[in-house]
């Protein structure tokens, strides 16, 4: 049996690296989760349930914005944050290629085991 790995046209670029690095932190994942299902939240609204300072939350938001996962804009005196779909879709697409690879590999293994006496 030949070992077939997913074909890739190019290695993951720096943007994908930033996305996965941003998602690796539980606080940043919690911030994304808070933004899910709402149009926008202010930085204060995002920070309220977290046990950390506003400057610490803002650093996490900087990482998320740098990865393209959120967008911020100023409305009056407050800064609004919202999710952006594109980067998450890029990450999901990259992961989906490997999901297909592992699913096919495990299916082949199951078939080989079923043929065993």
Residue ranges and their predicted role:
Residues 1-15, 33-37, 89-117:
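Amphipathic alpha-helical dimerization/coiled-coil segments
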Residues 5-6, 61, 76:
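Residue-level detector of intrinsically disordered/flexible regions characterized by low predicted structural confidence
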Residues 14, 59-62:
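Exposed, low-complexity/repetitive linear segments and helix-based recognition motifs
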Residues 14-55, 75-93:
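N-terminal helix-turn-helix DNA-binding core of bacterial DNA-binding proteins
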Residues 48, 59, 66:
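Alpha-helical residues within the helix-turn-helix
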